[in-house]
């Protein structure tokens, strides 16, 4: 597929070790050149108590951009959790980057090959993720984050 690497890291290659296979991918850094923090770091750490103030005004937009990207390119996520999403603030337009948990974990990954099924699964997992992490209010989904209807 022609999927741009705007919200997932660039793929560098496959690493094969005895009994293991791994993927080498782009390292997402923050403005200072350190590994970018995850949403989990921001939401549950003493070091980052809550969403960074510099991004709070655009929080809904950050989540909407990530959802739109997953939905548009039918990128099914099997493990949508806060620790798998990094905050890339290197540019004037910060973004969320999904670094792990991509793909279907079913024996027959129908959602990966049938966009209609994939998009239904993406929306269902997204809404569950937003509500589970209290990023939406459970009603309209507009006060604390972005939820699809």
What label would you give each PLM region?
Residues 7-14, 75-89:
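A short glycine-rich, hydrophobically flanked beta-strand micro-motif that places a catalytic Asp/Glu
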Residues 5-59:
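Conserved structural core of kinase catalytic domains
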């Amino acid at each position: 597929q022609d999927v741009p690497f705007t919200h997932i890291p660039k793929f560098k290659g496959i690493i094969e070790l005895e009994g293991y296979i791994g993927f080498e991918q782009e390292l997402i850094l923050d403005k200072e050149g350190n590994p970018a923090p995850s949403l989990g770091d921001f939401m549950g750490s003493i070091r980052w108590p809550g969403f960074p103030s510099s991004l709070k005004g655009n929080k809904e937009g950050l989540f909407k951009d990530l959802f739109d990207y997953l939905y548009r390119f039918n990128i099914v996520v099997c493990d949508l959790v806060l620790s798998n999403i990094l905050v890339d603030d290197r540019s004037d337009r910060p973004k969320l980057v999904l670094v792990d948990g991509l793909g279907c974990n079913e024996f027959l990954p129908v959602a990966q090959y049938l966009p209609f099924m994939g998009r239904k699964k993406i929306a269902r997992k997204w809404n569950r993720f937003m509500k589970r992490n209290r990023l939406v209010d459970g009603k309209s989904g507009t006060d604390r984050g972005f939820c699809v209807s």
